[in-house]
Swiss-Prot record:
Membrane topology classification: Single-pass type III membrane protein
Cytoplasmic side: 32-291
GO-annotated cellular components: plasma membrane
Ranges of compositional bias, category Low complexity: 181-211
Xref: NCBIfam families: PRK09430.1
Name this polypeptide is given: Co-chaperone protein DjlA
SMART domains named among the record's database cross-references: DnaJ
Signal sequence bounds: none
Length: 291
């Protein structure tokens, strides 16, 4: 209730038996209380908006820095950046801002560590956002099927600045570097590469690309990709796989993320992630790897 401070102040003024002056003082005190509460509300929503804007901005800055670190930005890099913008529903001015951020990240002296520290401070207590950010960068790094030494170095910097332990990050890398995973990413990169030439302008000269994206071929998940999604090994037992599934669903289920006041764009990403987790678990069950 927006005016409870004034009502409370008025009530206290009445019961104080000081007459009209008591009621006036009570109203004034209540007004100050209401203003303080309104200010805190505005600060909270401003912080939420700032955090989400910073998340998107840093995502594409780091993405540009990561892809440029290997010498040049490839068509596969442009492809994955475009797909990320689509997944985040960044269109119009938001898309142009993301493309500018991508170009900023490609600059030779881009202050990556400083930007990452700002993001970590803004996401304090929100490891779900940190993990989402890291997953995006990993997908970008492995999109062409080969992890360049410079990309690996940048990924270590990202993990370090975001507070991800070396052990956790090495496990993520092992899953991404599996032979089956590399082959599937190479195949997808070859299939999508030809369709991306006309998209490059938005990332190189500041203009948005035109034309419609051709439909991507449907690719079913494999046991290997399902294991990567759940963060397990094919040799893990049913209990371990089920525990990993439940943990991931607890982190990414949209119903639980509603209380965290994520933006609609992030909620959509969480929904898709939950669907991927569910599909991976069902695939492993159907493959008789779980009971």
């Amino acid at each position: 209730m927006r005016y409870w401070g004034k009502l409370l102040g008025l009530a206290l003024g009445i019961v104080s038996s000081t007459g009209i002056w008591g009621m006036i003082m009570g109203l004034l005190m209540g007004h100050w209380i209401d203003r303080a509460r309104a200010s805190r509300r505005r600060d909270y929503f401003s912080a939420q908006s700032t955090r989400q804007s910073l998340f998107f901005l840093t995502t594409f800055q780091a993405m540009g820095h990561l892809t440029k670190s290997k010498g040049r930005v490839t068509e596969a890099d442009i492809n994955i950046a475009t797909k990320m913008m689509d997944r985040l529903e960044l269109f119009g001015d938001a898309r142009a801002a993301a493309q500018r951020a991508f170009r900023e990240g490609k600059a030779g002296q881009f202050p990556l560590r400083i930007k990452l520290r700002k993001l970590r401070d803004a996401c304090l207590g929100r490891f779900d956002l940190i993990k989402m950010f890291l997953e995006i960068q990993l997908q970008v790094a492995f999109v062409d099927g080969v992890l360049h030494p410079n990309e690996r170095r940048v990924l270590y910097v990202i993990a370090d600045e975001l507070g991800v332990t070396r052990e956790q990050f090495e496990f993520f890398l092992r899953n991404m570097e599996s032979p089956t995973g590399q082959q599937s990413r190479q195949n997808q990169s070859r299939q999508n590469g030809k369709s991306q030439q006309r998209r490059n302008n938005g990332y190189s000269n500041g203009h948005s690309y035109g034309g419609q994206r051709p439909p991507s071929p449907l690719r079913g998940p494999t046991v290997e990709s399902a294991c990567r999604t759940l963060g397990v090994r094919s040799s893990d037992d049913a209990v371990t796989i089920k525990r990993a599934y439940r943990k991931l669903m607890s982190e990414h289920h949209p119903d639980k993320l509603v209380a965290k006041k994520l933006s609609p764009r992030m909620m959509e990403m969480a929904k898709r992630k939950a669907q991927d987790i569910q599909a991976a678990y069902e695939l492993l069950k159907s493959a008789n790897q779980t009971k």
